Regions:
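An anion/phosphate-binding loop that grips the pyrophosphate of nucleotide cofactors and donors
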Residues: 87
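Phosphate-binding/catalytic loops
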Residues: 96-150
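Conserved active-site segments centered on acidic
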Residues: 1-81, 145-150
Length: 150
């Protein structure tokens, strides 16, 4: 049986959405939920200063939490419309930042997207932003565990 897909979106698919994807998958596997996360970037061309496949801040937090990484760690990937159609749940990490990009590029999918308010590094320190993402990821996992236990 194919897992249900949650899709995390951010601008560059380098920091916030990647952390959310990896953290969600780690927790979902532990609880055998039948859900899997993936992530994509809405505008990879807007990202600047990226070194390597994933943010060092995301890596440090994942390491501190004992979350293993798939090897090799993939590089950021752009969003295409088919992913928005096939995902069962979609989360954009910051409404103020991502709503304009979605309106411009994928307006037909707006009604399916849940918006969070997690700022990028220019507005929030990594400890704050990544803690917000962790809390955001844990809540639906707990709901899914509760549902599957019934």
């Amino acid at each position: 049986m194919n897992p249900k897909i949650v899709l995390f979106l951010c601008t560059g698919n380098y920091y916030r959405s990647r952390f959310a994807e990896i953290m969600f998958n780690h927790l979902a596997r532990q609880d055998r939920l039948g859900w899997e996360a993936t992530s994509r970037g809405l505008a990879l061309e807007l990202g600047a200063g990226k070194l390597g496949p994933i943010s060092r801040h995301a890596l440090a937090r994942l390491n501190a939490r004992g979350v293993p990484l798939d090897r090799p760690v993939r590089y950021p990937l752009p969003l295409d419309g088919s992913m928005l159609t096939s995902a069962h749940h979609i989360v954009a990490l910051k409404q103020d930042e991502h709503l304009p990009l979605l309106l411009q590029r994928f307006p037909q999918h707006l009604s399916r997207i849940e918006f969070w308010q997690v700022s990028d590094l220019d507005c929030a320190p990594p400890d704050e932003a990544l803690a917000q993402i962790e809390n955001g990821v844990v809540a639906p996992i707990e709901r899914l565990v509760g549902r599957s236990a019934r």
